[in-house]
Swiss-Prot record:
GO terms for molecular function: cytokine activity; cytokine receptor binding; type I interferon receptor binding. It holds the Pfam family Interferon. SUPFAM superfamilies: 4-helical cytokines. One of its GO terms (biological process) is cellular response to virus. Disulfide bonds join 24-122, 52-162. This is Interferon omega-1.
């Protein structure tokens, strides 16, 4: 529990920068939507993670996708888009509706939908600039496998409260890692712009 608050604070701080610096003309409110997503996921906690220690699972988030040193805009946008699409899909089921507070869940759906629309616009622009289509398709397949593992886990655990709590924490962790990737690309773009 003590580790959760610094993680949330780091997520909020790293998502403060405007996404426009990624080379896309995304609306300024994209950073606000990202922060809201993380805050909503934090607020959705229904039970203490300590009650669910026996249910923990290593979902093997594909960290190689977010930790590379040669980041391309198309890759970053593809990873972010696919992650948000998969999170939206995961939390937009009948089973998730039964597990979570409907007001918070509706707010999460709305925020994710808005972020997806913004990222789709950005992806079209980046691909139009000639970045590799391979930089887009490879992360999508890898992330689909990762999220399929999460879905299988939920089914195995019969969509229990603890299973959903473990998944909620995993989603927050994966968003944190992708936010770090986004920040590294922003820094790289700033460094290139000042050279």
């Amino acid at each position: 529990m003590a580790l959760l608050f610094p993680l949330l604070a780091a997520l909020v701080m790293t998502s403060y920068s405007p996404v426009g610096s990624l080379g896309c003309d995304l609306p300024q409110n994209h950073g606000l939507l990202s922060r809201n997503t993380l805050v909503l996921l934090h607020q959705m906690r229904r039970i203490s993670p300590f009650l669910c220690l026996k249910d923990r699972r290593d979902f093997r988030f594909p960290q190689e996708m977010v930790k590379g040193s040669q980041l391309q805009k198309a890759h970053v946008m593809s990873v972010l888009h696919e992650m948000l699409q998969q999170i939206f899909s995961l939390f937009h089921t009948e089973r998730s509706s039964a597990a979570w507070n409907m007001t918070l869940l509706d707010q999460l759906h709305t925020g994710l939908h808005q972020q997806l629309q913004h990222l789709e616009t950005c992806l079209l622009q980046v691909v139009g600039e000639g970045e590799s289509a391979g930089a887009i398709s490879s992360p999508a397949l890898t992330l689909r496998r990762y999220f399929q593992g999460i879905r299988v886990y939920l089914k195995e655990k019969k969509y229990s409260d603890c299973a959903w709590e473990v998944v909620r924490m995993e989603i927050m962790k994966s968003l944190f890692l992708s936010t770090n990737m986004q920040e590294r690309l922003r820094s790289k773009d700033r460094d290139l712009g000042s050279s």
